[in-house]
Amino acid sequence: MREINSQEMEKIRMKNLTTPFRYDYVGSFLRPEKLKKARADFEAGKITREQLKEVEDVCILELVAKIKELGYHVITDGEFRRATWHLDFMWGFDGIEHKKTVDGNTTFDGEAAMIDDTFMVGKISIKNHPFVDHFKFVKALEDENTIAKQTVPSPAQFYAYFTGAELLDTTLEIYGTEEAFAEDVIRAYGEFIEEIYAAGCRNLQFDDCVWGGLVNPKLAVALTGRRGEALEEYKKVILALNNKVVEEAPADLIINTHVCRGNYHSTFFSSGAYDGVADLLFGEENVNAYYLE
């Protein structure tokens, strides 16, 4: 009988460890107190970035050990290296900058999130995105029963952030048209996927609050600056964005999506049923599976 080599064994293992599992989770966890303290100390200049990373490493190791103990088959870093679920990913691109907010932004049921103001200063490009190294750390913790999952904001989320009512003018100054920006988002995501796939990622999750925002008719208009037919066309644009990135990804990369209505200090960003987006989101988006709230 022919012996199975290591590459073949890895393919067999990956085939049996594809998300979603019967019992699963989204991937973001509440930050431990020691991590919150370390991040605050770093922002105050009391510790170095390397010292912060040491605390992050310890917290991630403890989290993964607990996840395995509970019998889950997917492991993540809990997003412990991020300030937010989505903006840190954007900050990893050239052409995107951020600064500490003064008044807060993104209102969650009456509370303004005190997260960095994020803005575009040039055309986006990517090389050596920091999330790739973040993934490698978790990848090294895989065993025969677990597979590492990487979460990132969806292409639609990236596009929507910079084509919303507040930032669209700046985006058009840089790109000229929304179509040109959309093409660059597709290209940039393709390059990121190429990098993280080469690092061994086979389970990728698109976190997507765009659809969660669009379920609320009034909020949809406020966020996008569009209404009526223009808003319906916008929904088709973000659907096409996600689908194009999925289409161009490697065939054996599992891409799932997580749709929610936002969460900050246990408050919500949006509310409403899926009816207004269901046909597009569930009928035409070509992801492998949905994590829904």
Language model region names:
Residues 3-293:
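Domain-level signal for soluble alpha/beta catalytic cores
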